[in-house]
Every structure is written in structure tokens, then in C-alpha cells.
A protein has these predicted regions:
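Ankyrin repeat domain, specifically the short helix-to-loop turn at the C-terminus of the second helix
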Residues: 21-29, 57-65, 91-104, 131-139, ...
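N-terminal segments that cap or nucleate solenoid repeat domains
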Residues: 1-51
Length: 191
């Protein structure tokens, strides 16, 4: 990735006397699709550092970056959810509504089988959990490769507010047995 573009994403710099994001991304069709050695796009970098205005501008110019995955198959939504950047999550979800990709993005899994909700629960970011569940309350949020559902992760870690939110808001939460055939109820009791 162009170091100037990376630095701008890291700092959330949409434009100053030396740099203008729109000009930089529009100058070359490939600019928006440049990646870091880990496969992160400029949108991933903005999500990592919590720059919602920068993310919004990137998506206006290159909306296809919304569903791009890095080398760990993470989208920018996975990264923002993991870091607890609520405003970035809001921007990404708003863009999904504009481009009719809501279900696709919220249901995408990374290399471990985690959705963005798995990441938000594991990192204990309640505001992000609420946004994600509200955005796609019809989804069952199946287990990841370790057999953990978001409901199981919330129960196992004692993240009671997330547990309650998932149970109250998610129309069909997955109660499947997790690791060692323990259900979310087992995990809550053991915790």
C-alpha cells in the first residue's frame, strides 16, 4: 500500500494541504484496492484506528471495499467490532443499507469462522454487540470453527449484558452445544 495512503488512514486524514483522499483514491483505479502485507485495505486500516469519517469518505468513493477481506478473511467490520469502534461500525452498517449488502456483511466469517458479532462479544464491546444484533436479528449466528456461538462466548465469559441483549433481540439465537458439548447454559453455570 502507498505509504501516504496508509499514513492518512492511520491518522484519519481526509485532506490537508498535502493530501486529499478523494483525489488520491480517484487518481488510479487500483488505489483503493492497495493492501498492506497482511492484506488490509485502506478501509481495514481506518477501522483499526477508529476513524469513522475517513471510513465514510472511502466508502463514498470505493464502496466495494466494504466486503473486502484481508489474509485472515476479516472485513473492516470484523476489525471495527473487535476494537470496539462503535462509530466505525455504524458507518459500515449504514453503507450496507445503502448498497443492500447488510446480510452479506454481518454474516461473513473470518478464517476462524467468527462473525463480527463473535469478535464484539469476545472483546466485550456491548454497544457494538447491540448494533450488530439489531442490524441482523434474523440471523442465527452459528458456531465458529471452535464450536463457539456468540451466545456461548457471552455466557462463558460472564458478559451478562451481551447475553441478555442477544437473547432479547436475536429472533433465533443458536443454542448449539459448544466446546466439550457444553451449551451456553453449561458455560454460564461453570463460569
Amino acid at each position: 500500500m502507498d505509504p501516504i495512503l496508509y499514513s492518512a488512514a492511520m491518522r484519519g486524514n481526509i485532506g490537508d494541504y498535502n493530501f486529499l483522499l478523494a483525489d488520491h483514491l480517484k487518481r488510479d483505479e487500483e488505489n483503493g484496492y492497495q493492501v498492506t502485507p497482511k492484506g488490509n485495505t485502506v478501509l481495514h486500516v481506518a477501522a483499526l484506528y477508529g476513524h469513522s469519517d475517513f471510513a465514510r469518505e472511502v466508502l463514498k468513493i470505493t464502496p466495494a471495499l466494504l466486503c473486502c477481506q484481508n489474509k485472515k478473511n476479516e472485513t473492516a467490520l470484523h476489525i471495527a467490532a473487535n476494537e470496539g469502534h462503535t462509530e466505525v461500525v455504524r458507518v459500515l452498517l449504514a453503507c450496507t443499507r445503502d448498497h443492500n449488502t447488510k446480510e452479506k456483511l454481518t454474516r461473513m466469517t473470518d478464517a476462524s469462522g467468527d462473525t463480527a458479532l463473535h469478535k464484539a462479544v469476545r472483546s466485550q464491546h456491548l454497544d457494538v454487540v447491540k448494533l450488530l444484533v439489531e442490524e441482523d436479528s434474523e440471523f442465527e449466528y452459528p458456531p465458529n470453527h471452535a464450536q463457539e456461538t456468540p451466545l456461548y462466548l457471552a455466557a462463558e465469559s460472564g458478559f451478562h449484558d451481551a447475553l441478555i441483549n442477544i437473547l432479547e433481540s436475536c429472533k433465533k439465537p443458536t443454542y448449539a452445544a459448544g466446546p466439550s458439548n457444553r451449551t451456553p447454559l453449561h458455560a454460564a453455570v461453570i463460569q
